[in-house]
Amino acid sequence: MELFVGTDIVEVERIKKAFDANSKFLERLFTQKEIEYFNSKRMKLPHIAGFFSAKESISKVLGTGISGFSWKDIEICHDEKGAPAVILKGKAKNIADKKGIRDIKLSISHTKTYAISCAIAIGGEKNDSADLKTDERS
């Protein structure tokens, strides 16, 4: 068994600059469900920065950085209690399966100026994916 940990912190201003400079910023990095969540929060930049940070943290858990798969292969959502949750798709899911990762726990926090996240997973054994939350459409 192996413990995988990833953390990330991002300045909200950095996300604002990227958002202002590229009209396709959201569509390039986030799934439709994530964008719908941002719309429900009136596109508040700290929420967007938090999801960005979470995707970075998860890429560190997977050990590849974002270069190993698409940004949209990681989807941030919320469980029935409102806690952040992770859905892996495509290449990100394949990497998690190879590492035997069954579940990823995620924490996200933000202020007006920073967003931070921490992702933790246990793996190391071959996994049948039964416990990992996935999107079967991918």
UniProtKB/Swiss-Prot annotation:
Mg(2+) binds at D8, E56. Its EC number is 2.7.8.7. It comes from the Bacteria. GO terms for cellular component: cytoplasm. Gene3D superfamilies: 4'-phosphopantetheinyl transferase domain. Signal peptide: none annotated. Its main location: cytoplasm. GO terms for biological process: fatty acid biosynthetic process. It is found in: Cytoplasm. Transmembrane segments: none annotated. Keywords: Cytoplasm, Fatty acid biosynthesis, Fatty acid metabolism, Lipid biosynthesis, Lipid metabolism, Magnesium, Metal-binding, Transferase. GO terms for molecular function: holo-[acyl-carrier-protein] synthase activity; magnesium ion binding. InterPro entries: 4-PPantetheinyl_Trfase_dom, 4-PPantetheinyl_Trfase_dom_sf, ACPS, Ppantetheine-prot_Trfase_dom. Its cofactor is Mg(2+). It catalyses: apo-[ACP] + CoA = holo-[ACP] + adenosine 3',5'-bisphosphate + H(+). Belongs to the P-Pant transferase superfamily. AcpS family. Transfers the 4'-phosphopantetheine moiety from coenzyme A to a Ser of acyl-carrier-protein. This is Holo-[acyl-carrier-protein] synthase. It comes from Thermoanaerobacter pseudethanolicus (strain ATCC 33223 / 39E). The lineage of its organism: Bacteria, Bacillati, Bacillota, Clostridia, Thermoanaerobacterales.
